[in-house]
Swiss-Prot record:
It comes from Dromaius novaehollandiae (Emu). This is Ovotransferrin. It is found in: Secreted. Keywords: Disulfide bond, Ion transport, Iron, Iron transport, Metal-binding, Secreted, Transport. Monomer. Residues 7-14 form the Transferrin-like domain. The lineage of its organism: Eukaryota, Metazoa, Chordata, Craniata, Vertebrata. Belongs to the transferrin family. Transferrins are iron binding transport proteins which can bind two Fe(3+) ions in association with the binding of an anion, usually bicarbonate. It is responsible for the transport of iron from sites of absorption and heme degradation to those of storage and utilization. Serum transferrin may also have a further role in stimulating cell proliferation. One of its GO terms (molecular function) is metal ion binding.
Length: 14
């Protein structure tokens, strides 16, 4: 599972 930081970055990237 990816860390929350990565999830947030992915959301911003999208």
């Amino acid at each position: 599972a990816a860390p929350k930081a990565t999830v947030r970055w992915c959301t911003i990237s999208s």
